[in-house]
C-alpha cells in the first residue's frame, strides 16, 4: 500500500505542476508587440459573401480587397466621440460607422489599490486595439459605399442614464440617396448587454438591399485583465456557437493558419479574456455567415453577416442584434443566448465545477465573504467524503498496527523482493487489510480539487475578492506565501499520523512531498490554497480521531 500511496502522491504533485503548464499552453497567449503606432481605422473587414439567395448575395467589405470599401483615413478624434454612461458601462461611440471604440466597466476597478480607475475593455489607442463594429453592407449598405463608411450625427455628444431611468436610447442618423438610416443603441440599467437596431426608411424610387454585419476586432496585445502570478495568461481568443458545437474556441493561432467560414442559424460570436467576454448575438431565427480572419494590419477578427434584407421603394425595414461586453456573469450570459454561459470555461470537469460554483455562490449569499465561503464549502465537501475518508484512515490505522510485523518480514526476507511481497500480501489477508484502501479517497477527491481550481481561476466573482488580513485577492497567489507554508506544515504533520513506509527510499520520498507541494502551491490562487489548508486540518482531526479509536479497540481486544 505504501508504494501505491507514494505513487499517487507523486502523481498529485506532477498534476499540480502540469496544471501550471497546461494553464500556459491551453489558456496562454503570448503577447505580441502592438501592430501600429497610431490609432487604427475602424473600417470593417468581413467575409466576401453572405448567406441567402444567391441572386441577391453581394460582396461585403474586406480589408485589402481592391474592389471593396477603402479604409477610412483615421478614427474620429476623441473629443468628437459620442459618450454614453450607464450605471455599469462607460461607452464611446465613433460617429464614423457607429462603432464602439471605448468601453469601461466602472463596477470593476482596473487595480485593487486604485478603485477609482475602471477596467477598460475596449480601446482604440496607440497601445491597444479592441472594438465592436456593426453596420449595413451589401448592394446598397452604407458601409459598402466607395467613399467610406457613413458619418452619423446625433442630437447630443453625451448621454447618461439618469436616476430612476431604466433604459437609455442613443440614435445615430445618416441619409444617402433618398434612404434614411437610424442606428439605435438601447442601454438598460444593470445590464452589460445592449441592443443595436438598424432602421432603414427607403424614400428612393429603387428597391434597397443590404446585409447586417457585426464583428469584434482586436490586435495581439496582452490581456490587461490577466494578473496571474506565474506570468502566464488565461485564454485570450475567440469563440463561437454552432448547432454541432455549442462552444468552440478559435485561437489567434487558428486565425493565423486559416479563415473560418460557417453558416449557422442564430448562434453567437465572442472574444474571451480573463474574467471578461464580448459577444455579438444575432436574432436566433436568422441565418448568418460566421467568419474569422486576420487583416493586413495584423488584427484578429471574428464576426457574422446576416441574410440579405430587401426593402421595396417607399417601404421601411430594420434588423437587430445584441452586444454583450462585460464580466463573465453566468446568469446574464445564459439569459442572453444558449451556450454563451460556457464562455466561463471550467474545462473538462465542468459538470463538477458548475455545482461547486452554484453551492459556493449560495454560501456567499449568506456569508458575504468568498474566503469564508470557501472554508464552509470545504467543510461540506469533507462531510460528503467522510465515509470514504474514514475507511481510508481505518486502513492506515491498521497498517500502523502491523508496521512491526512488516518490518520483521523485511528483516526475514532481506533482498528477496518476491518472497517479501508474497509474505506481505499474506499478512494483509490475515489482518483483513486492503493495501489500496488509502488510495481511493485521494483518487475520488482529485476531480473535486481540479474542478475547484478552475472555479477559482475562471469565476469573475473571485477577482479582487478579499478574505481577511493579508489576503486581499483570492484569485492570485498569497503575496507573503503564508498559506502555502501553512499547507506544507499541515501536510508534514499529517504524515506523522501515517505508518512509516518500510522501504527507506519510499520514506524519503514521502518526507519530500510537503516540500514539493509547498513549492507548487506558492503560485496557486490563494483561494485554492485556503481550500487545501482547511481540508488538511479537517483531515488531521478526522485521522487522529479514527486512529485513536482503532488503538483503543486493539487494547481492549
UniProtKB/Swiss-Prot annotation:
Polar residues: compositionally biased ranges: 52-77
Record field: transmembrane: 7-27, 370-390, 436-456, 514-534
Coarse class of the protein's main subcellular location: membrane
Subcellular location: Cell inner membrane
Membrane topology of this protein: Multi-pass membrane protein
Gene Ontology biological process: protein insertion into membrane; protein transport
Gene Ontology molecular-function annotations: membrane insertase activity
Keyword entries, A-Z: Cell inner membrane, Cell membrane, Chaperone, Membrane, Protein transport, Transmembrane, Transmembrane helix, Transport
Positions of region (Disordered): 42-77
Entry keyword annotation includes Transmembrane: yes
Annotated GO CC locations: plasma membrane
Subunit structure: Interacts with the Sec translocase complex via SecD. Specifically interacts with transmembrane segments of nascent integral membrane proteins during membrane integration.
Function: Required for the insertion and/or proper folding and/or complex formation of integral membrane proteins into the membrane. Involved in integration of membrane proteins that insert both dependently and independently of the Sec translocase complex, as well as at least some lipoproteins. Aids folding of multispanning membrane proteins.
PANTHER family assigned: CYTOCHROME C OXIDASE ASSEMBLY PROTEIN COX18, MITOCHONDRIAL (PTHR12428:SF65), OXA1 (PTHR12428)
Family: Belongs to the OXA1/ALB3/YidC family. Type 1 subfamily.
Protein name: Membrane protein insertase YidC
Species name: Azotobacter vinelandii (strain DJ / ATCC BAA-1303)
Gene that encodes it: yidC
Amino acid at each position: 500500500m505504501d508504494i501505491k500511496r507514494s505513487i499517487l502522491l507523486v502523481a498529485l504533485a506532477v498534476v499540480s505542476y502540469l496544471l501550471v503548464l497546461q494553464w500556459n499552453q491551453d489558456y496562454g497567449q503570448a503577447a505580441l508587440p502592438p501592430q501600429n503606432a497610431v490609432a487604427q481605422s475602424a473600417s470593417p473587414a468581413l467575409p466576401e459573401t453572405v448567406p441567402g439567395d444567391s441572386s441577391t448575395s453581394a460582396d461585403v467589405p474586406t480589408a485589402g480587397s481592391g474592389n471593396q470599401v477603402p479604409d477610412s483615413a483615421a478614427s474620429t478624434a476623441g473629443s468628437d466621440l459620442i459618450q454614453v454612461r450607464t450605471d455599469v458601462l462607460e461607452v464611446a461611440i465613433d460617429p464614423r460607422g457607429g462603432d464602439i471604440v471605448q468601453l469601461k466597466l466602472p463596477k470593476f476597478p482596473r487595480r485593487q489599490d486604485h478603485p477609482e480607475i475602471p477596467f477598460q475593455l475596449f480601446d482604440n489607442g496607440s497601445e491597444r486595439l479592441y472594438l465592436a463594429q456593426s453596420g449595413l453592407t451589401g448592394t446598397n449598405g452604407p458601409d459598402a459605399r466607395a467613399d467610406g463608411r457613413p458619418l452619423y450625427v446625433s442630437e447630443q455628444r453625451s448621454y447618461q442614464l439618469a436616476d430612476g431611468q431604466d433604459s437609455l436610447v442613443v440614435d445615430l442618423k445618416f441619409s444617402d440617396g433618398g434612404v434614411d438610416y437610424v442606428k439605435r443603441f438601447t442601454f438598460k440599467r444593470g445590464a452589460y448587454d445592449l441592443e443595436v437596431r438598424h432602421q432603414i426608411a427607403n424614400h428612393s424610387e429603387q428597391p434597397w438591399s443590404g446585409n447586417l454585419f457585426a464583428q469584434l476586432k482586436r490586435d495581439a496585445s496582452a490581456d490587461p485583465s490577466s494578473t496571474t502570478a506565474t506570468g502566464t495568461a488565461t485564454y485570450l481568443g475567440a469563440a463561437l456557437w454552432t448547432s454541432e458545437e455549442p462552444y468552440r474556441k478559435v485561437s489567434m493561432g487558428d486565425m493565423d493558419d486559416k479563415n473560418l467560414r460557417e453558416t449557422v442559424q442564430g448562434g453567437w460570436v465572442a472574444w474571451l479574456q480573463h474574467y471578461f467576454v464580448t459577444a455579438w448575438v444575432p436574432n436566433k431565427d436568422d441565418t448568418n455567415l460566421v467568419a474569422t480572419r486576420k487583416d493586413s494590419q495584423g488584427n484578429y477578427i471574428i464576426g457574422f453577416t446576416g441574410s440579405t434584407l430587401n426593402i421595396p421603394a417607399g417601404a421601411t425595414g430594420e434588423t437587430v442584434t445584441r452586444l454583450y461586453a462585460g464580466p463573465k456573469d453566468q446568469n446574464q450570459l445564459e439569459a442572453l443566448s444558449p451556450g454563451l454561459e460556457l464562455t466561463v470555461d471550467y474545462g473538462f470537469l465542468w459538470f463538477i465545477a458548475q455545482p461547486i460554483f452554484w453551492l459556493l455562490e449560495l454560501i456567499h449569499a449568506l456569508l458575504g465573504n468568498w474566503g469564508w465561503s470557501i472554508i464552509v464549502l470545504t467543510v461540506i465537501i469533507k462531510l460528503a467524503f467522510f465515509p470514504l475518508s474514514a475507511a481510508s484512515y481505518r486502513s492506515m490505522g491498521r497498517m500502523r498496527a502491523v508496521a512491526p510485523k512488516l518490518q520483521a518480514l523485511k528483516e526475514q526476507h532481506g533482498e528477496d523482493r518476491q518472497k517479501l511481497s508474497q509474505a506481505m500480501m499474506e499478512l494483509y489477508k490475515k489482518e483483513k487489510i486492503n493495501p489500496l484502501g488509502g488510495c481511493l479517497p485521494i483518487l475520488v477527491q482529485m476531480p473535486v480539487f481540479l474542478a475547484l481550481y478552475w472555479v477559482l481561476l475562471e469565476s469573475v466573482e473571485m477577482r479582487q475578492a478579499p478574505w481577511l488580513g493579508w489576503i486581499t485577492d483570492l484569485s492570485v497567489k498569497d503575496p507573503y506565501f503564508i498559506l502555502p507554508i501553512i499547507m506544507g506544515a499541515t501536510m508534514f504533520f499529517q504524515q506523522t499520523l501515517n505508518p512509516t513506509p518500510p522501504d527507506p527510499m519510499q520514506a524519503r520520498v514521502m518526507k519530500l512531498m510537503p516540500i514539493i507541494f509547498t513549492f507548487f502551491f506558492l503560485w496557486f490562487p490563494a483561494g485554492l490554497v485556503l481550500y487545501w489548508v482547511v481540508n488538511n486540518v479537517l483531515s488531521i482531526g478526522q485521522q487522529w480521531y479514527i486512529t485513536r479509536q482503532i488503538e483503543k479497540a486493539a487494547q481492549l481486544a
